[in-house]
Every structure is written in C-alpha cells, then in structure tokens.
Amino acid sequence: MLNKKQQAMYKDQRVGIFIDVQNLYYSAKNLYKAKVNFNEILKIAVGNRKLIRAFAYVIKTDELKEKTFFEALENIGFEIKSKDLQVFYGGMKKGDWDVGIATDAIELAPKLDVVVLVSGDGDFTPLVEHLQRVEGCKVEVIAFGKSSSSKLIEHVDNFYDLDINPRRFLI
C-alpha cells in the first residue's frame, strides 16, 4: 500500500474486501478508456494476509454482457451483491451501494483486523472513521487517486493509488 501513513501488513491479519464496482469501473473508463483487472485488485488487497470475505457490489442493468462479468468476478473469489438499476420518472437513473457497503463492513468488522474499501468515494469517510474508532479496524483504500476524495485518503490507514501503475490494473 502506498500512503503517507504506510502501515505494516502481517500474514495473520484477517482481511475483508468491499469493492464498489461501479466506482472503479467508471474511474477506469473515464481516466484510461479501459476496464479494471479485478483479479489484480484482489491480489494486492489481500497481499499475504488471510482473506475472510471479498464482496463485489454491482448494479444490474439489461446488458447481456454483465452476467458473464458477474460470473468472472465470482470465479476469482468475490461474493456478488447486486441490485437493480433504479430508473426514476423523467429518466434519471441511480444505482447506489454506499449504505449497503457500509452496513456489510460494520457487520463483518468484529471478525476483521483490516477492512479494504475499493472505492475513492468520499461518502465513505464517516464509515472509515467508525471502523477505526469504534471497531478497532485498520482501513485501507484502493482506488485511482485522480478520481478519489482527498478527505477519504486523509483518513485511511493505507491508500493504494492505482494511478501509480495503471497498466497493472487495467485490461
């Protein structure tokens, strides 16, 4: 992990991974016109530590390709949590997993030493503070620094900036 507050990783640390797939997908698409290599993300998130659970939070649309994508995520070790894209009157669309990710992280925290959030969304800052202060967990974030909240980065124990070596994490 690369951060001003570099923390050591220990092989006995229990790790839970929570990936905001939409956040990472759109960051890679907008910054690099590429797709994310989720297998590489999983490898750096776990490191040499003990993986307890890894969740990928996805939004279902009507695209045929997404079923194959979701199966690929499962095949590399992610548990898929999905919800339908909400379409509101007037055409506005919303697919938001922030509360679901926060709830799952808080529920699993007593069984973890480290929570890894894969998202640069600043809305997770209160979650980070809660996990550190109340649950006693270290919190790491993996995201593209160019599209990440500086406030979120400031609060985490470790930040891995995918922009430092983007080719490793893109396909």
Indicate where each model-derived feature is located.
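Nuclease catalytic cores that cleave nucleic-acid phosphodiester bonds
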Residues: D62-I171
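Domain-level signal for Mg2+-assisted phosphodiester chemistry and nucleotide/NA-binding surfaces
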Residues: L2-W97, C137-K138
